[in-house]
């Protein structure tokens, strides 16, 4: 029997999704087509993998770190030509299927303990593109992470992550997932989210993206402080004030009160200011 005797490993963040209704919602959110090539991070025991293959997609490529699960997955899907499997850490190994043709979608119940760095690898970061441009990512993540990704300005969950990801992808929620939907049950709720990475012509200029990343990181390190107290690490207050005024930015606000595009406007002003100083 595949997976007989395997005990979920806490250090790998293993929780098996066993709720068919949630699996169906994930498939629906992925908008699967016959020509789709799917990357699945951490297929585990293969519950989602099986549903993906039943959807008649062209290929499902799994990346799994747990050597015991690799054995079970090979047994479960033996003879399935549309399933390929790679052993390794999704943060470091190549994510390309064996034929070298990249997947176009990511559908995964990703381990909670690597969510942040894995998102950066899959979507890229401000000022740097990802290795592969995916059309859509449908991910099951910890609810607290989903709240930060989807948060609006002024909400307590609005963070540097909110700004970065909302400038890189269109983000939306699919559904909340109760702990009882998993075995073993996690201590927290989860959420299924959709991330549609922006097309190249929708992305900002990379210099502006890098500037946004820099000022957002500095500002949110002191999220309780007003912008006039944090951004002076970048630009003297007497020069910062007219820059902010031109964009209608109130420097008495705190970082979580500014929408992503306001950060972009501020970044552009600071880019111009920086260039003027170098002349």
From Swiss-Prot:
Its EC number is 2.1.1.182. PROSITE patterns: RRNA_A_DIMETH, SAM_RNA_A_N6_MT. Gene3D superfamilies: Ribosomal RNA adenine dimethylase-like, domain 2, Vaccinia Virus protein VP39. The keyword Protein biosynthesis does not apply. It is found in: Cytoplasm. One of its GO terms (molecular function) is 16S rRNA (adenine(1518)-N(6)/adenine(1519)-N(6))-dimethyltransferase activity. GO terms for cellular component: cytosol. NCBIfam families: ksgA. It comes from Prochlorococcus marinus (strain SARG / CCMP1375 / SS120). Its main location: cytoplasm. This is Ribosomal RNA small subunit methyltransferase A. SUPFAM superfamilies: S-adenosyl-L-methionine-dependent methyltransferases (SSF53335). Keywords: Cytoplasm, Methyltransferase, RNA-binding, rRNA processing, S-adenosyl-L-methionine, Transferase. It comes from the Bacteria. Pfam families: RrnaAD. CDD domains: AdoMet_MTases. S-adenosyl-L-methionine binds at residues 15, 17, 42, 64, 89, 109. Specifically dimethylates two adjacent adenosines (A1518 and A1519) in the loop of a conserved hairpin near the 3'-end of 16S rRNA in the 30S particle. May play a critical role in biogenesis of 30S subunits. The gene is rsmA. It catalyses: adenosine(1518)/adenosine(1519) in 16S rRNA + 4 S-adenosyl-L-methionine = N(6)-dimethyladenosine(1518)/N(6)-dimethyladenosine(1519) in 16S rRNA + 4 S-adenosyl-L-homocysteine + 4 H(+). Belongs to the class I-like SAM-binding methyltransferase superfamily. rRNA adenine N(6)-methyltransferase family. RsmA subfamily.
């Amino acid at each position: 029997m595949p997976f007989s005797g395997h005990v979920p490993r806490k250090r790998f963040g293993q929780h098996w999704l066993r709720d068919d209704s949630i699996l169906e919602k994930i498939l629906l959110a992925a908008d699967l087509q016959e020509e789709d090539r799917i990357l699945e991070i951490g297929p585990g025991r293969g519950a989602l993998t099986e549903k993906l293959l039943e959807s008649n997609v062209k290929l499902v490529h799994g990346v799994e770190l747990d050597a015991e699960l690799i054995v079970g997955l090979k047994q479960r899907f033996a003879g399935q030509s549309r399933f390929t499997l790679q052993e390794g850490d999704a943060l470091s190994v190549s994510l390309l299927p064996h034929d070298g043709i990249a997947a176009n979608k990511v559908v995964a119940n990703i381990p909670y303990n690597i969510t942040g760095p894995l998102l950066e690898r899959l979507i890229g970061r401000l000022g740097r593109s990802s290795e592969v441009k995916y059309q859509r990512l449908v991910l099951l993540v910890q609810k607290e992470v989903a709240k930060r990704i989807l948060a609006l300005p002024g909400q307590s969950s609005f963070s540097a992550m909110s700004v970065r990801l909302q400038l890189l992808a269109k983000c939306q929620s699919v559904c909340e997932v109760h702990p009882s939907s998993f075995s073993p049950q996690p201590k927290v709720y989860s959420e299924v989210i959709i991330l549609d990475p922006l097309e190249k012509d929708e992305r900002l200029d990379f210099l502006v993206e890098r500037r946004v990343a820099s000022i957002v990181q500095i500002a949110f390190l002191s999220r309780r402080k007003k912008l006039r107290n944090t951004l002076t690490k970048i630009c003297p207050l007497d020069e910062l004030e007219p820059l902010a005024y031109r964009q209608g930015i109130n420097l008495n606000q705190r970082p979580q009160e500014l929408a992503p595009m306001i950060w972009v406007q501020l970044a552009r002003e600071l880019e111009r200011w920086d260039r003027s100083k170098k002349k």
